[in-house]
Curated annotation (Swiss-Prot):
Keyword Transcription regulation: yes
DNA-binding region: 78-131
GO biological process: metanephric ascending thin limb development; metanephric DCT cell differentiation; metanephric loop of Henle development; metanephric macula densa development; metanephric thick ascending limb development; negative regulation of apoptotic process; negative regulation of DNA-templated transcription; nervous system development
Xref: Gene3D superfamilies: Homeodomain-like, lambda repressor-like DNA-binding domains
Residue ranges constituting the POU-specific domain according to the UniProt record: 1-60
GO molecular function terms attached to this record: DNA-binding transcription factor activity; protein homodimerization activity; sequence-specific DNA binding
Protein name per its UniProtKB record: POU domain, class 3, transcription factor 3
């Protein structure tokens, strides 16, 4: 299965997402990985094998022409582009961190507004700097 999947150019995450879209059962990348490594229970392997065989047949038969499987893979979870923080903004975050390394949600919101950053970016910055 693994070799055929890779030859077709699909990731484990693509397969899990496609199974959900095509057959109604979404499987995580971890589950597909464990299937390939034969690390699932016998019962779960038996449940997953027919779905994966069906998916492989459809993927094999559609090579060369864009299909629903290709479209599903294309709309897979997109990662957010890495955030780059300007030097002046980083300085402001660092000075606030020295005063208060664990700001409240309200403080994070206020700081994000004042620095014109997304609240999530500020929250993650503080989490990363605690480590």
């Amino acid at each position: 299965f693994t070799q055929r999947r890779m030859k077709l150019g699909f990731t484990q995450a693509d397969v899990g997402l496609a199974l959900g879209t095509l057959y109604g059962n979404v499987f995580s990348q971890t589950t597909i990985c464990r299937f390939e490594a034969l690390q699932l229970s016998f019962k779960n392997m038996c449940k997953l094998k027919p779905l994966l065989n069906k998916w492989l047949e459809e993927a094999d038969s559609s090579t060369g022409s864009p299909t629903s499987i290709d479209k599903i893979a294309a709309q897979g979870r997109k990662r957010k582009k890495r955030t780059s923080i300007e030097v002046s903004v980083k300085g402001a975050l660092e000075s606030h961190f020295l005063k208060c390394p664990k700001p409240s949600a309200q403080e994070i919101t206020n700081l994000a507004d004042s620095l014109q950053l997304e609240k999530e970016v500020v929250r993650v910055w503080f989490c990363n700097n605690l480590q």
